[in-house]
Structures are given as structure tokens and as C-alpha cells.
């Protein structure tokens, strides 16, 4: 091969190598492109995967949020929601448009001293908060967050300016949550066993109880004054109306805390009142309530009619006056309603109050300012939830449950002591030594309550009640904090008359003794304890018949072995009135001020002490006599149904002295009757049928009941039927003609019975042919 051919071959080989190199390079670039494409696809897939994960996480969070908002909440979660969504939802109007007029407190009791309630802040509240938290734990017992938020939206939509608006706010944001939490506690066996939390409710319908009679009943409009005058002139005990120790006044707080008693009755644990937010300036609350002589200063300024020229001082003095008057109003309620606990609710604050029954002149106050104490919202409020309004009011309620409200004889005794030791606005305490201390000095002054439990448990209250202390983290048996009766040596809290109150309380606690004068006194304190007499017994008394051997008290009725009643109907009524004249509490006890009451009166259990007759009375106020008299005419028209379809009517009596009620009202008139029975149980299938039978029976006698309240239809086991009560709204008409003869009717009465009824019912005309009384 020539050199030329060899060169050509080498060139071809070079070109082929170059081509192969370029081809390899192209393949490498193609592979690189494919790798980059694969990488891009992988990154895209990863991005889609991450997006899917993010979307799934977001959806999971939303589901969890919705589940969280719709599921029930724990105790701490509920406190958080109530404060954040309800309490903070309050929006106040421009207060400059509203009057800052003073609360009307002239003539009302006010304390000499105002002191910090440090025992509540340092002992009671921490104890009860820990106790509730330990009982509830992490159980989801309370309403969901979305429910609380929805209510908060409604609250924030309405501006609050006056007391009515504050009323609605307090009910929604504070009272309803507190009642819900206490309801859970009441069903818990540990709390129930320790009597820490009974069934409870807030009640704001007090004004219905003692409002003046409007005359809207079945009674004739012109019967009251005339018939009362006739009764006073014609009655066997004609005497002028005696004056009572106290003047009845319109002492009606905005609300009371009602608790159920073990026996089924109801009693009040505390009193509360609402105030418009602009009438209790929160910027002055702490400084004002730290002044021991706040009331003395305010009363002196008002009496002297002195105003400072400095605008800031004027604002402070006006704020102090409004706060002092708000406290005075509730203090007066606490005294006259016989309770040691009360509070003022003013939207942005609660003023929790306590009075020691051994020291009437000192009012203890714990200001609750949740907005300041809890602060701004954060991710973790756990350590500040005890400062919320709901948490503090729960502890206040639980504290109040350990004290008993005074009633009857003990209430009147306590009011006698209060009248002797307290001044009414705007009288001055003559012995007040105003020291002119600054608020800081006053707040740091020694107080007996720092080391003393006596201001928590009054000497006048029943002993033997303990407060169980339970550690949240301990499984050991609960420790017990006994209610001590000892007082701090630094100050004597005893006031004149306190020993008399303790004596009355001790007698009430011991119950009746056996026989003698002391036994009568105990009976006056404790009230009747015997079983009710039977319908047949009291009907026999009224008709002049033999004793009922089935009456549980027949041995007390029987004298000298006789089978006849020892007194007639007229003598019976006269003796009851004489017994109540000596003391309205002698053999007489209100059954249940809050539960056993009708539209116009309250139920009493009475015993005619010498003979053991035990029956009931329907007591009412001075201005409601006409309605009782009307009811007496109804019973007269239903005469031969008495003791069967309706109770046995035994006449009207007057309590000249009056049986004292919470709030300084007095039961003055009382209608005496046999005990009708109990409310039918829900399991009684034929209750409605029996009710219609009884209604038909009275309709056949010309009576339309006019009050369909369920409480007016009672099951009487002795008669095996439904009895009807409360005829103050009933309407009378002549019986239908021809009158249907009821299978339930009794035999016709003897002629002499009508004359006996004429003495019982007073100057009413007797129509003997119809055996009924008409006006």
C-alpha cells in the first residue's frame, strides 16, 4: 500500500473515530437529558406528594379543630372558653349618656367596717378550685367550644349599658356556666357524700313573691277593707292591730342562690344584685374596697354636703360613693334575708361579700376583676384560669353552701341584734375612730380572718359540718378541715345580743325537749314534728263527730278516755289564733319558702300544742286578705266535698305580730286546712283521669278552679284520689240545675253545722237550702 493510500486510510479511521466520539458524546448528552428529565419527574412527583401530605395535614387539622369545637370540654377548657368567648365579649356603651344617680339606700343597714376577705382569697378559693379540678379531671363534661363561641357572638352583638343588659350578660356569661359546673358536682358521689355541693340554681324572680296584690283574683274587688273591719269588730278576739318591730319595706334583691336540702326543701344560700358597669368604676374598686372606713367617709361627705373642687378627687369620691351604696344595698339584703354571703355583679367585676354573724358591723369584700387578673389571651392560660369570674363564683357558691340561712325565730332574733348594733343610711356611727390611713396601710392591717376560720363558720350556724380537703395528686383519704368556733385574740367580734342568737340556734339544733315550758320553747324554734292529722280526723273535728282512730295523733287528741274531740271547730280556730298571738313561731314552721308557695302565699305546718292537732296553714301578706276570704267562700260552697275532693277548711286567723319572711316581709293572715297530700308521681298512670274527676266534682258545685298549675293537684293516699287546693283564683256560680249527683259526694250535713260555719267564716250569709255560703 502506497503512502497515499495509507494516509487516506488513516484519515478515514480518524474521521470514524471522531464520528464515534461525537456519537458517544451525543449518547452521553441524551443520557444526561434523560437523567435530568427523570430527576425533574421525580421532583415533580415529590412536590405532588408533599402537596398531598400538606393538604391531608390541613384537612386533618380542620377535622380535629371541628371535632374539638364540637366535642365536650374539660373543666379547664371550659373555664378558658367562658372567659375568652363569653366574659371578654362584653361591650359597654358610651357611659356618658347614662345617669350616674346614686343607689337608693336611705334607711337601709350599712356596716361600720369594710375589710378584705383574705380568707376567701387565700384559703377557700384555692381549696375549692383544686377540689373541683380534681373531681372533674380530664373528663369532657361541659359544653363544646362552638356552643360557647356562638353565645359569645350573641353577647357581643348587644351593647350593655344599663342594669337590665348587665343582668342578661351575667346570666349568659357567668351564672349559666357556674350552674352547669355545680350540676356536675352535685351528681358526683364524693362531692355529694361530703355535702359539698347540693342541687342548686340561680333565681331572679324574687319580685314576684312579695309584690303588692293587684286584686286580680276571683274575689270581689270591694271585699278586703270592709270584711277585715267586720272581722275585727265581730270576731271573738276583737283587738286593735298590733305594731310589729320592723317596717315592711321593698327589700327585693335582683336574685338569690337557691339550693336543695336533703329532705327536698329549698333554701337560699346567698343574695346578689346587678349594677350597671358605669356605676361601679373598676379603676377605683381596689382602692375603695381597701378602705376600712369607706362607709363612714361617704356618709360623712353626703351628710355634710361637701364636694372637692379638684375634678379628679370629685371623680374618685363619686366612684367611692357609688361603690359604698352598691355594697350597702347587698349588705342590707344579706342581713334581712338571714344569709352570710352576697355579691354585686357589675359586668367587668364581681364584689364577693361575707358577714360574720358574730360581728354584724364588719363586711368582708373580695373584689374580682377577671380582665386584670387573667390578663391578655395567650397560648397557655392554665395558671390563670382560677382568676376567671366563673372559677371564683364557683368557689363562692361552694363556700356559701356550708352556711345555713336563718329563718323564722332565728331570723327575727338576728334582726333584733342587727337593729341594736347597726346604723341605717345615713345615720352615723358615733364611735367610729377614723384613723385616716392610706389604702395600702389599711390593706396590710392585721385581720382576724388571716388565721381564723370563725368568719367562715358562724357560731350561730349548726355545727358538725366539715369541709373535705382533697389533694389533686394524692390518693390518700381526704383530709378534713373542721369548722372552728374559735376567734382570733386580736379582736373581739362578739356584739351585744350575739349570745342570744347562739342560744336560739342551739335550741333549734337540739330540737324539742320532753314536756314543760322548755319543751314549748324548743317547739317554737324547731316547729311541729308530728305527722299530719288525717282528713277524717279534722273533718270529724269540724263536724263534731268522733275521733278518727287511724289518725297518728289520736292519743294526743283523746282526753279522759273519750271518743269525742276535746274542742269544737270554733274553739280550735280560736286556740290556734291565741297560740300564734303569743308567738308566731310556737308550733308553727314554714314548710319551704322557695318551693312550697303558691301565687299568693306560703305553706306552713302547724300544731295545736295542747292537743297535738297537726295541719297546714296558707299564710299571706297584709294586703292579700281579700283573696283568702274569697278562698274561704269557695271552700264553704264545696262544704260537703271537704276532706275528700278538697281539704278540710278550718277558718282564718290573724298573726298580729306576723311571721317574719326573708326580706322583712310578714305573714299576717293564715288559712287553716288539713294537709292535702303530695304531688302525684310521674309513674301514676291514672293521675289525669283522677284530676278530671275531682275537677268535675267541684264544677258540679258551681266552682271553676281557674288555676291549672300542676302543684294544685295532690295525691291523697288516705282518700285514694286527687285533691284540689288553691282556690284564690276560682270563680263561683250557682251549681248546675238539675245538679248532677257526684258519686264522690258526702251525706248531707246536719242543720247545726251551718251555724258552726257561720262562726268560722265570719259575717257571711248562709243559704241553708243550698248548703253553701254566698256573699
UniProtKB/Swiss-Prot annotation:
One Gene Ontology biological process: meiotic drive
Coiled coil location: 4-69
Keywords: Coiled coil, Cytoplasm, Nucleus, Toxin
GO cellular component annotations of the record: cytoplasm; nucleus
Primary location recorded for the protein, binned into one broad class: cytoplasm
Segments of this protein annotated with the region Disordered: 18-51, 211-249, 442-525, 734-761
One annotated GO molecular function: DNA nuclease activity
InterPro entries per record: Kinase-like_dom_sf
Highest taxon of the lineage: Eukaryota
Mutant lacking the gene: phenotype: Sensitises spores to SPOK2 encoded poison.
Biased composition (Polar residues): 444-457
Subcellular compartments: Cytoplasm; Nucleus
Functional note: Promotes unequal transmission of alleles from the parental zygote to progeny spores by acting as poison/antidote system, leading to poisoning of progeny that do not inherit the allele. May possess DNA nuclease activity that leads to spore killing, and a kinase activity that confers resistance to the nuclease activity.
This protein's name: Meiotic driver SPOK2
